[in-house]
Amino acid sequence: MDNRKKLYGVVPPMITPFTEGGELDIPGLEALVDYLASEVDGLFICGSYGSGPLMSVEERKIVAETTLRRAAGKIPVVVHTGAASSRDAAELSAHAASRGAAAVSAVGPYYYHHNADGVLAFYRAMLAAVPRGFPVYVYHNPRFSGYEIDLGAMKKLADEGARGVKDATFDIMKFALYQRELGETGFDVVLGTESMWLSARALGAEAYIPG
């Protein structure tokens, strides 16, 4: 994905196959990527559906490398790099960028209660870990992070280089607010559910990550 372009179309959150023993199922992962590559417009990996938070950093790197290698030249891949620590998120983001990801995205830091400054510091660490201009998406999912990221903080992140937001608030009014206040500046507001697609499309949405 060109740094200036937005995500487009249907970008499903891909599951991560495991063996019965709990190990990564690499042949299954490769087969899944091969199947989806001709059916959708992009892939979102290692997110909630992809069991990202349940995997080690090394396992997540293996999933990213395998998916990116298999999808190369076919469809863009967005790698979810969210973690409880900014150190892990930065490491995973740098790795994904170096392996050919179209973008990275991360749910904000979780488990502990974070104030606005802590959330901003988390995403700044991600931005600092990737090449300048590389697409970094905020994954706004209050159900899992435990807090809302307010419009002021989102504007700061946009000003500092964040490429867009995956809005998983399931609140069409929140989506409309982001689209009105940030979408016209080039900030990519991506819908994080298929259930509101028609309304979001009318508001200017160009992509959704169903879930």
Give the positions of each predicted feature.
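Catalytic alpha/beta core domains of metabolic enzymes, predominantly
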Residues: 128-131, 142-211
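Intrinsic-disorder/low-complexity regions
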Residues: 1-2, 166
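Active-site beta->alpha loop and helix N-cap motifs at the rims of alpha/beta catalytic domains
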Residues: 2-146
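A general structural signal for stabilizing positions within well-ordered secondary structure
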Residues: 1, 95-96, 156, 199
